[in-house]
């Protein structure tokens, strides 16, 4: 008859439903925790505490289910597996969001004129210093870029100076700066795309 919810077998609930719930809850709270740490490092004082509230709330619910079902070893496995999976998903989300700024330092061993011209034409602020390394003269190129634009800069390095050494450092705060023009992307995770100019 419609509207009647069948009783769930207690053994099935204990052995299947509870471990699955714990697994999913751990994924959620660890993913939120990863994002909270990122927002704290970015100095976002409003979002970070809010995420912290939901993180600890979900964690308490998950731990409460374990204490109510201490005899089921699947709960412990689900707890650990959810923690590991949550870390992985959190890193994927962080990479997708690509929030904040990064300092990229490029050291070239040959002429870097084309790379420098491309970066400046694309709208990136570039500072160039003369350098001298083991294999002779070169250039050290500094640029502060939005993390969502890092792929564009790395592609340019691989195209114009494929053997150049470069390193990337996160920046918590920066004043002024020159960045490429962006337009809104089609999805919430796009956060704009770089308008690449022709070479």
Swiss-Prot record:
Subcellular location: Cell membrane
Coiled-coil spans in chain: none
Membrane topology term: Multi-pass membrane protein
TM region(s), chain numbering: 12-32, 47-67, 73-93
NCBIfam families, sorted: PRK04164.1-2
Gene Ontology cellular component list: plasma membrane
Pfam families the record matches: DUF2179, DUF5698
Top-level division of the source organism's lineage: Archaea
Keyword line: Cell membrane, Membrane, Transmembrane, Transmembrane helix
InterPro entries found in the cross-reference section: DUF2179, DUF5698, N-reg_PII/ATP_PRibTrfase_C, UPF0316
Gene3D superfamilies: 3.30.70.120
HAMAP family, per the entry: UPF0316
Residues of the signal peptide: none
Name the record gives this protein: UPF0316 protein Memar_1511
Family per record: Belongs to the UPF0316 family.
């Amino acid at each position: 008859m419609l509207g009647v919810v069948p009783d769930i077998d207690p053994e099935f609930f204990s052995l299947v439903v509870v471990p699955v719930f714990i697994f999913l809850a751990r994924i959620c709270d660890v993913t939120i925790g990863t994002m909270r740490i990122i927002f704290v490092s970015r100095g976002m004082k409003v979002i970070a505490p809010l995420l912290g509230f939901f993180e600890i709330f979900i964690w308490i619910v998950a731990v409460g289910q374990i204490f109510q079902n201490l005899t089921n070893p699947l709960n412990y496995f689900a707890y650990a597996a959810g923690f590991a999976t949550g870390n992985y998903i959190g890193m994927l989300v962080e990479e997708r969001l690509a929030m904040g700024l990064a300092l990229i330092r490029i050291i070239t061993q040959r002429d870097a004129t084309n790379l420098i011209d491309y970066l400046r034409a694309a709208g990136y602020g570039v500072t160039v210093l003369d350098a001298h390394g083991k294999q002779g003269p070169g250039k050290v190129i500094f640029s502060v870029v939005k993390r969502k634009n890092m792929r564009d800069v790395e592609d340019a390095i691989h195209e114009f100076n494929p053997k150049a050494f470069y390193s990337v450092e996160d920046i918590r705060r920066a004043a002024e700066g020159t960045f490429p023009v962006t337009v809104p992307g089609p999805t919430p995770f796009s956060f704009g795309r770089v308008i690449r100019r022709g070479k």
